[in-house]
Amino acid sequence: MLEIPTLFDVFAEAGKEVAIVAVNGCSIDTIFRRRKVDYYSFRTDAQSFEMTKKLLEEDKYDLIISYYTSYDHLSHKHGPYAPVSEDALETAVRYFEELTALTDRVWQRADRVIAWVPDHGNHVVDEHSGTHGTNTPEDMVVNHFYRLRAAE
């Protein structure tokens, strides 16, 4: 478990409502436990995605972290460029686009930030698997995307 203060802690200590939505047992679900945030853990990414949409519609939270784990899992098992891994990445992009549109609709009267923040890269180990954690560009150089949107 990660014990240093994080963005989640800063928001919670400032009186903001924070939710972490993820697959049960994945890294994000486990390393940020024991914080003053609400946790929603599910068996699949699809269930996490549906809960994230529900939480956005309820408009209770100031910060929602929705973590998609399938690409990471499948790229370890099959390699980052395997068709099944690429399909999972396409699903992640589709989920992000849908959540972005929903956030813009639900939170249109609020200033907001939408962010796509991968936690690491990945490289091919052999023809059947991938991994991360080395000091190589494939593992260390990741693109983060964000958009600031003013209240309407």
Residue positions per predicted region:
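Feature captures the catalytic ectodomains and active-site-proximal regions of enzymes
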Residues: 1-152
